[in-house]
Amino acid sequence: MKKIIFILTCLSTLGGHLVAQNPKWFKKAAKAQISIVTMNEKGDMLQSGSGFFIDKNGTALADYQLFKQASKAKVVSGEGKEYEVEAIVGVSSLYDLVKFRVKTDKDTPALTISDRMGVKHEHVYVLPYPTKENKMCVNDTLHDIQKFNEKYGYYTLGRPLDEKYLNSPVMDEEGEVLGMIQRKANASATTSYAVSVAYGNTLFTNGMSSADNDLNAIHIRKALPADEADIRTFLFMTASRSASTTYNQYLNDYAEQFPKSSEPYTQRADFYMAHGNYAAAEEDMNAAMDVAEKKDEVYYAFSKLLYELNLKPGYT
């Protein structure tokens, strides 16, 4: 663990074409950058890298390869605060992106995502992860922009950047983030590439995500979809694939996202009943009754649970 914390707080020196003076927004932007260590189930380190927060709720972006096969991950912010990654929000293996959320009860510093795609030959700044040895932005230009998905940019920058710039944000003059530096195609590449952060922010799970091989290659719990109908589909498809503790957490997340719906409580009551936690099951059925508009449906669900319970051998 000491090795992991050391890597998180002391990333290697980064080289590049540094500006003579950082823009006025640099210090604030640097606080949103994070160092990341991914681990296996035993807590052994798999990989280390960097990324950055894109909203105050602890949502961040990094490269997908960094999280592949990981069971756990920890991050340290530019302010020196340590967080645990609690959920994977979405992925794109095609664009080597992962969107994830850390566990926090306070606002996190975050970069502002530009609503512009940017224009060719626009001056930009590349922000390396700040260290004592390297606290300066890198000057660059948007040499070319390829549009994808109708409104997002895949950027070619004017000069090559070291691999240690991977996942660094590409900022415009106003201090808003346009892109994230991508992995080099080959060691002799004379340019660098960045993918739209606005596109990365569109990555979410959906009802069919439990069958997504790219998501399943990351063994960290997934964030639930935003739509309740999608959550029900996700839970149905996840039930046989997830460990009981993970599935229980999904049910807790469901109740937290939709506290005024009776469905998360009846589903969690079913789970508790199946695992012999009858007091918790009764508590959830009462909670479902409190919020239900159609109370007859809750009575039916409860009676069904009691019937199934009485069919169990040895139950009296």
Where are these regions (language model features)?
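C-terminal cap/linker of serine protease catalytic domains
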Residues: 22-26, 108, 180-245, 250
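Conserved active-site neighborhood of the chymotrypsin/trypsin-like protease fold
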Residues: 55-125, 132-136, 151
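TPR alpha-solenoid repeat register
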Residues: 230-232, 264, 298
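Short coil/turn linking the two alpha-helices of tandem helical-hairpin repeats
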Residues: 239-241, 274-276, 303, 308-315
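Flexible, gly/ser-rich surface segments that form the specificity/activation loops bordering the active-site cleft
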Residues: 21, 25, 108-154, 158-165, ...
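A conserved glycine-rich beta-strand in the N-terminal activation segment of trypsin-fold
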Residues: 21-22, 39-57, 63, 82-84, ...
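Short coil turns that delineate tetratricopeptide repeat
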Residues: 259-260, 293-294
